[in-house]
Regions:
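A short, structured beta-strand/loop element
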Residues: 17-58
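Context-gated lysine
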Residues: 3, 29, 37-39, 59, ...
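Well-ordered alpha/beta subsegment
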Residues: 52-85
Length: 85
């Protein structure tokens, strides 16, 4: 379970699953509260997919969207290196 390295958001765990499927995405979890998938090569409407638990706050979703926008190229490079090995 390789960690997303190009950015960090306090209190969130961000990672890739090795040998995961397209489209490029990573998982984000707030321990004991929720987990979502963040699709970073897709349009905004399809960016977040709830996995379990409560819905993340608007503030958290905005932080993730900003991080993805800033680090999209690095996320794609990490996806290729860690997932499509």
């Amino acid at each position: 379970m390789p960690k997303v390295e190009c950015f960090e958001i306090p209190s969130l765990h961000c990672w890739f699953w090795s040998n995961d499927h397209d489209p490029p995405h990573f998982h984000v979890k707030r321990e004991g509260e929720w987990e979502i998938k963040v699709k970073f090569a897709e349009g905004e409407e399809e960016m977040f997919e709830q996995q379990w638990g409560d819905t993340p706050s608007g503030k958290v979703l905005r932080q993730l969207k900003k991080a993805v926008t800033r680090h999209r190229a690095a996320l794609l490079a990490e996806w290729e290196a860690k997932v499509n090995q």
